[in-house]
Design a protein with these regions (language model features):
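Feature captures the catalytic ectodomains and active-site-proximal regions of enzymes
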Residues: 1-388
């Protein structure tokens, strides 16, 4: 029974792409920055071949890699979660999703006010924790919604759970999602509930993403159409708006995501288990916390042998990322335009170097190839590529 476990280490870039400067990113390298932390330890991924990947100049190379290893190029125009995951699944995005460094236009906000019956606060790029510190009191006093964005293509709505019940906040996000289409089709509308008293507001785990519907067929659609199981762990369900997915489970962070992965390794199914581990990006990358990022990578690396021990003879483990988020890059707090790693491990895989690939979509093509499915998108399998 063939199974693929595809794990996305959210934001784990391995060095700037040639066009990074066009995205405002100069000398960015998530792996390079994190490797300088005293908490950096990736012995198991080293054994797989992480430091043997083209262009990786940190860490110790291994003479006997246990996995196939590849440097992946993002072909799409962008560096965000949505576009990165879409490309992994086969969608090329020739234009970046819209961003709003000066806030959202008045016509968008006016329609939002009319349809929700609530006014808005802020309307500018802001740190998620700082925005509730700065606007939380006024929100609690007036009931106005805190609307803000970031360097990414997002429309975020923060509201205190005692002022706006979470389900109502989700309804407001659905309204925003309906409004934000076409020219203003942001990648994600995000609910950001919070609790607490003045001066001590904290965000709750009940965040929810309302993504743009994928504009073309994906690897997930093809697997589901072929009768395979497509299991989503973490925010994969939201990124693809449930399309092409047969079962999903949300997680509260990396530790739970890894535990859910171990549980699915022990279940019987045929198809794909697609996992997103978000803490690298959400807790450490954007917050520019090098040591926190390093510790989170070390934790995953420590769990790798357990994951591998639960694999069956026809299982393939794939590890990659969707973009970079260099925690040492201080010009912005946003994502960084980087190459990503791709490690492929299991009995059906011949270890070795697969070079540098021209698109993340080669990952989707590789998954489909393993199940004998011809991709309905541009992408080439590296499953049978000659290792060098």
């Amino acid at each position: 029974m063939k199974r693929v476990f595809l794990i996305v280490l959210d934001s784990f870039g391995i060095g700037e792409m040639p066009d990074a400067a066009a995205y405002g990113d100069i000398n960015v390298n998530t792996l390079g920055s994190v490797s300088k932390s005293p908490f950096f330890h990736m012995e198991n991924m080293k054994n797989m071949g992480l430091f043997n990947i083209d262009g990786v100049e940190v860490g110790e190379k291994t003479d006997h890699p246990t996995a196939a290893y590849t440097r992946m190029t993002e072909r799409s125009r962008g560096k965000d979660t949505t576009i990165g995951h879409w490309e992994i699944a086969g969608i090329y995005s020739p234009k970046p999703l819209p961003t709003y460094p000066d806030g959202f236009p008045e016509d968008v906000l006016e329609e939002f006010r009319i349809r929700t019956g609530r006014d808005v606060l802020c309307n500018k790029p802001y740190s998620g924790t700082q925005v509730i510190a700065d606007y939380g009191d006024e929100h609690v006093r007036t009931g106005k919604l805190i609307v803000y964005t970031s360097a990414d293509s997002v429309f975020q709505i923060a509201a205190h759970e005692d002022v706006v019940p979470v389900e109502q906040l989700y309804d407001y996000c659905r309204i925003a999602r309906q409004i934000l289409q076409g020219e203003h089709g942001v990648g994600r509308v995000i609910a950001r509930p919070f609790i607490g008293e003045s001066g001590h507001y904290t965000r709750t785990p009940r965040r929810h993403d309302f993504s743009l519907l994928p504009p073309a067929v994906t690897m997930l659609d093809q697997l589901k159409a072929a009768g395979k199981d497509v299991i989503a762990v973490g925010k994969i369900q939201d990124i693809f708006v449930g399309r092409g997915i047969t079962e999903h489970v949300y997680t509260s962070g990396n530790a739970e995501g890894i535990e859910r992965t171990l549980e699915y390794l022990d279940k019987d199914f045929e198809g794909l288990c697609f996992i997103n581990l978000v803490d690298y990006d959400m807790l450490y990358g954007h917050r520019r916390d090098v040591d926190g990022y390093a510790k989170a990578l070390a934790y995953f690396d420590e769990k790798l042998p357990e994951i591998q021990a639960h694999m069956k003879p026809e299982d393939i483990l794939m590890i990659t990322a969707d973009h970079g988020c260099d925690p040492a890059y201080t010009a912005t707090t946003g994502h960084t335009r980087e190459y990503t790693p791709f490690l492929m491990y299991g009995a059906p895989v011949t270890p070795g170097n697969r070079g540098t690939r021209p698109t993340f979509s080669d990952i989707g093509a590789t998954v489909l190839d393993y199940f004998g499915i011809q991709p309905e998108f541009e992408g080439s399998s590296v499953l049978k590529a000659d290792p060098s």
